[in-house]
Structures are given as structure tokens and as C-alpha cells.
């Protein structure tokens, strides 16, 4: 299920959200969205039939660290007015992954031909928001300079089940000097709607993670000399829950290819 890493276009880094979505919708941009539309919230996406939506909502409510719900759509409605007045979820994500009966079947760049009147969209906060806050504080994130994203891993940490939905906690890893790790914990704790504080610091083996084995080969596994790995809950956890629950049909964003919204990152800070 590993997807090739798409080309990143740094010329869009200062684009506003509308320009980014238009580039995705009309110009066929299919790359990672990290660094695009600085200052604005990006969202993980999961789209399910309405018959599965209530159990999935309960799963999100029971697991707010990996599933910090920003909004859900009305049934059959491709808009998300809480995030922007001009989002069309069928076209505005760079890459989508489609699952049937829990199995990944294809990756596409447009889901208009897959859209149904019974679908409900869930949008979750994304760690790209707190990454901006870390950078604003002077904490370096090397992977961004290399046009990459944080490493993604399947841990052995559990989530709380809801109906058919359960999953191991998917995590992202960023490495820091001890001093910067302390500051990163303080900063990200201010952003519970984009995964909040870390779930683990230090030895990856304690949470069942091998840094050489990334989920879908996504992200940078590097831990620099004198640095320690720090792990955050990841918005790909719902994708794993879907794979275990095996609904007949589901659509998610592809890893690190998010929905760019009109919400300000600063609006999600709690203090």
C-alpha cells in the first residue's frame, strides 16, 4: 500500500488556503501539504456511509488525541462550512485512499465519481498546525527543510473501542535535543485540537515501534546525535480503525496530503 513520494512545490509555501485548494482542484497538485498556507489549519479526512457514522463518531469522542474532531458534514453534503465556505471535499484533497470492506483498493486524486448521497465526512486536526508553532519558537524541524514529513509508525498502544472501531495508536516521531523536547511538550500542549502533547518520549521499543519500519514508508526516521525521539498521536489512527472495522466503503486522505482549511492555527490554541 506504499505510495511513491510526490513532488513538493515550494513556490506555493506562502499561498493562502483558497489558492492551495484551487491548485489542488484545478492544477492537479498531488504533493504533500506540509508548509502550504502557513498559519492555517490542515485536516485529516475520513468519509463513511451514514450507517457507520455514529459508531465512528463515538470512536473519535473516546480517542480525542488521535481523532481531534474539527467538524462532520451533513449526510451527502460535500461541503464543510465550519472549515471554509468554499470547500468541496470531493476535489480539494491532493490524494485520497479508497477502502472496500477494510481493504485498500486504490489511490485517486478526485472522488466525484465515487461520491454517494449517504456519505458523511469527518475532519480532524493535524499536527502540521503545531509544527508551525514549534518553528515560530525557533525549534528546528529538519525534515521540513528536506521537503519531508515526520515519520509515521504503528505502535502497540491501544485505543478505546467503539462498536466495530478499534485500532492501535498510530504515532508520528520528531527528534529534538533534550532542551527543545521540553519546549516542544510545552508548546504542543496548547493545541489539543491538533493532537496536543506527546504520548511518549524516549525509547521507541517501549511502545512497540521500530524506527526503521515506517507506516506506508512515510516520513523521516532520523534521530540526530544527542537527540531523543518524541512521539505524538497521529490522525491516521482512524484509517487503521476503518481497516479493522471493515465497512463496505470508506475514503480517507492519503498520508500527509491534507485538506487545507480557512481556520487559523491560532484559533485552536487554548492558552
From Swiss-Prot:
Enzyme class: lyase
Gene3D superfamilies in alphabetical order: PSTPO5379-like, PSTPO5379-like domain
One term of GO molecular function: lyase activity
Lineage: Bacteria, Pseudomonadati, Pseudomonadota, Alphaproteobacteria, Hyphomicrobiales
InterPro entries: D-Glu_cyclase, Putative_hydro-lyase, UPF0317
Organism field: Afipia carboxidovorans (strain ATCC 49405 / DSM 1227 / KCTC 32145 / OM5) (Oligotropha carboxidovorans)
SUPFAM superfamilies referenced in this protein's UniProt entry, alphabetically: PSTPO5379-like
Keyword Ribonucleoprotein on entry: no
Alphabetized UniProt keyword annotations: Lyase
Superkingdom, taxonomy of origin: Bacteria
The keyword Manganese is assigned to this record: no
Stated family: Belongs to the D-glutamate cyclase family.
EC number(s) given by UniProt: 4.2.1.-
PANTHER family attached to this UniProt entry: D-GLUTAMATE CYCLASE, MITOCHONDRIAL (PTHR32022:SF10)
Protein known as: Putative hydro-lyase OCAR_7359/OCA5_c07590
One Pfam family from the record: D-Glu_cyclase
Database matches in NCBIfam families: PRK05463.1
Amino acid at each position: 500500500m506504499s505510495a511513491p513520494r510526490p513532488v513538493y512545490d515550494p513556490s506555493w509555501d506562502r499561498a493562502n488556503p483558497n489558492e492551495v485548494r484551487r491548485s489542488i482542484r484545478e492544477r492537479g497538485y498531488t504533493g504533500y501539504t506540509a508548509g502550504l498556507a502557513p498559519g492555517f489549519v490542515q485536516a485529516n479526512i475520513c468519509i463513511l456511509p451514514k450507517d457507520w457514522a455514529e459508531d465512528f463518531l463515538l470512536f473519535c469522542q473516546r480517542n480525542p488525541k488521535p481523532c481531534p474532531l474539527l467538524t462532520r458534514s451533513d449526510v451527502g453534503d460535500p461541503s464543510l462550512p465550519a472549515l471554509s465556505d468554499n470547500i468541496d471535499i470531493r476535489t480539494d484533497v491532493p490524494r485520497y485512499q479508497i477502502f472496500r470492506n477494510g481493504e485498500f483498493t486504490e489511490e485517486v486524486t478526485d472522488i466525484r465519481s465515487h461520491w454517494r448521497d449517504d456519505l458523511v465526512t469527518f475532519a480532524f486536526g493535524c499536527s502540521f498546525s503545531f509544527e508551525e508553532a514549534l518553528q515560530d519558537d525557533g525549534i528546528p524541524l529538519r525534515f521540513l527543510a528536506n521537503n519531508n514529513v515526520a515519520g509515521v509508525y504503528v505502535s502497540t498502544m491501544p485505543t478505546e473501542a467503539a462498536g466495530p472501531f478499534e485500532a492501535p495508536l498510530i504515532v508520528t516521531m520528531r527528534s529534538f535535543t533534550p532542551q527543545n523536547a521540553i519546549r516542544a511538550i510545552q508548546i504542543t500542549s496548547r493545541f489539543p485540537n491538533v493532537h496536543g502533547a506527546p504520548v511518549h518520549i524516549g525509547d521507541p521499543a517501549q511502545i512497540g515501534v521500530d524506527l526503521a519500519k515506517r507506516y506506508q514508508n512515510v516520513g523521516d526516521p532520523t534521530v540526530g546525535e544527542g537527540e531523543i525521539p518524541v512521539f505524538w498521536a497521529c490522525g491516521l489512527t482512524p484509517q487503521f480503525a476503518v481497516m479493522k472495522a471493515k465497512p463496505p466503503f470508506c475514503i480517507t486522505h492519503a498520508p500527509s496530503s491534507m485538506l487545507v482549511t480557512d481556520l487559523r492555527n491560532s484559533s485552536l490554541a487554548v492558552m
